[in-house]
């Protein structure tokens, strides 16, 4: 699986066991992601932070 880094022009290949890509946003500003990468389990959203997870190459 390949996941985009913070700047989508760059990406990395995920290590074994991390088979989801994610994008993290601040709830107050959903237009600008603050973090992207590989993850094993999609975190729950909170009052401040929203996560979007997916499982295809560079989907984040």
Swiss-Prot record:
Disulfide bonds listed in the record: 3-21, 14-38, 42-53, 54-59
Tissues of expression: Expressed by the venom gland.
GO terms of molecular function: toxin activity
An individual GO BP term: killing of cells of another organism
Cell compartment(s), UniProt: Secreted; Target cell membrane
Major localization listed first in the record, in broad terms: secreted
Pfam families: Toxin_cobra-type
Family: Belongs to the three-finger toxin family. Short-chain subfamily. Type IA cytotoxin sub-subfamily.
Subunit structure: Monomer in solution; Homodimer and oligomer in the presence of negatively charged lipids forming a pore with a size ranging between 20 and 30 Angstroms.
General function of this protein: Shows cytolytic activity on many different cells by forming pore in lipid membranes. In vivo, increases heart rate or kills the animal by cardiac arrest. In addition, it binds to heparin with high affinity, interacts with Kv channel-interacting protein 1 (KCNIP1) in a calcium-independent manner, and binds to integrin alpha-V/beta-3 (ITGAV/ITGB3) with moderate affinity. Preferentially binds acidic phospholipids like phosphatidylserine, phosphatidic acid and phosphatidyl glycerol.
Name under which the protein is recorded: Cytotoxin 7
């Amino acid at each position: 699986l390949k996941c985009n880094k913070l700047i989508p022009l760059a990406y990395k290949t995920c290590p074994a066991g991390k088979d989801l890509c994610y994008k993290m946003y601040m709830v107050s500003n959903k237009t600008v992601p603050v973090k992207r990468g590989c993850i094993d389990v999609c975190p729950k959203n909170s009052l401040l932070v929203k996560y979007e997870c997916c499982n295809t190459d560079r989907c984040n």
